[in-house]
Every structure is written in structure tokens, then in C-alpha cells.
């Protein structure tokens, strides 16, 4: 993972370093450097596997004195991903076992005041769909994984020791999306219908499935949308073939987690795929401004903005055709103006009615 986190005046930078056919006498070919200095051995974490060729290097920088690093650590792995809570960093990667099964190795590091400390590591069965499948809350780590042809929920304590689990969920399906919200977790599996599961995690030793809603299609991305609502962006079949799938917006009422309801949906007949499925940062979801912005491929490449209220359901505010290969289209707003960024072109619109104001080609 190449990313960064800002926490209490310190910037934590995550960078990658790959090792390829190093010469033993040239240490810089297999030991990461920070500020042109090799990491010391006590700052390198080794894996159990012998095949790791990639480092994730975490570097702490005091933003008041950015020319100096306060700490660095290198974790050797095979292209792991990262999740950061307010106090801890978790690096996780999928491990292929000899029997063909998959497990997830998790390593935990505490961070604060510019210091990084290794805490614990463990493995759980299965693999994580994305970073929304892992969450820390009140000192416990909660995960939802796909295990072979079933799925599981795991709860781990501060030492990454298992306190509770639910296994053998949704046979022959896999997890498509997840979202943890306090003591409740939601996750979607799919084969022919979309089961949206609700799990009560208030007792770390005894997680319980408390709800299961089955509807057509599936949600690839879940996002809280105001009080008691959960937005889903996914797909629904428009026929008997996967080629007939179309992008779908769903709004779920989660005011009662044991009785979740899909209270509205809209299927975009001309949209076959959305970047929301792979990159959540491409989605603009703001309940206060009532904005749901996302990009789709289909009959034409389009950036959509929808709103939602309980009386009218989903309403379209704007549909703007973008460039043909506009994978990185983004929508943002500042005060009363919405900006659509498409490659080297920026367009501005009034938030009140989405009338175009201006455009700029860089």
C-alpha cells in the first residue's frame, strides 16, 4: 500500500520497496533506505514465508519539522495492504497455503507521537475483500473473510488473539462489500440474490447474525448516508446473462439492524460498470449536502449525481458525459460550487441547480 495518514501532528507515509536479484555485498539493494540511510536491523520485520520480495516502509514525519523523520520501520511481505485506526496500523496480506486454501496474515503496529512499535501478528482463515472488511472498535479488531466456499466473521483482542467468530456463512457465495458501524457490521454476499447480513458485535466473545435481507443483485460498495440509512452501489441483472448486469443504487433502512429494508433502488439501464466497485475514493457521498456522485461505463462514459430523500427516493441531479477513457474522473464541491475533474479539464456547476458556470482546460 502506498498511502499516508495524518495523526496528531505527525504524517505517516507508507511506501513500497521491491527486492529483485540483489547482490549480497550491496545492502541498499535489499534493505530500504530512509533519508539515504539504511534501516537498522531492529527496524525490519521479517515474515514467516521465504518468498517475500516487497517491503512496506512506514516513515513518521513531524509536520512542524518536515526535514526530519522521527521513526521508520520496514515490513517485508508480498504486496500487503494496510488499514489504520486512530491508534494502530494493521498490515494484512493473503497467503496461499499448500492445500490451495487462503489465509490472511495480519501484523499490528501502534503509532503515536511519531513512534512506531510492533505489537502482534496472527492469521485468520480466508481472505479480505477490501479495507472495509477490517475494522477496529473499542480495542477489538473485527473482520469478515471469504473462506473457500463459505464466509466468516472474526473478532480479535488487542493481542490479536481470537475472542469470537461465526463461520460457514452463505455457502457457495463470497463477500462483495462490508461496512462496520459501531457495534453493528453489515456485509453483502452474492450468488443469485444479495443477502445483506447484519451482525451484532457488541459482545466480542459472541458475535451474532441478527438480520439477513435477500434482494436481487448485489452491492459492491456500502456507505452510511445519514441517520438510519445505508447506501449501496452495485449491480442488478437485467436478464439471464452476466452481460445484462446494470449499475444499481440501493438505499437501505438500517434503523433496526435486525430488520433491514431496501426502501428504494434505481437501475441505470445504460451503465454496465462503475469505478466505485474498485476505488471508493471515486465516490462522492455526502448526506448533509444530499450528493451521491459516481462514474459509470456503458453506452457512454458518464458522471452521475443523485440525491435521496424518504419522500421522493432517488432523484437525478446531473448526468455529464466525460472523456472516453476517463477512469479517474472525480467530483468535489467547495462552498456552493461543484467541480467535475476529468483529466486536464475542470468544469464548475452551481450546487443549487447544477447549471454549468465555467470550464478550464489545463
Residue ranges of predicted features:
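Beta-sheet-rich non-transmembrane sensory/scaffold domains
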Residues: 1-362
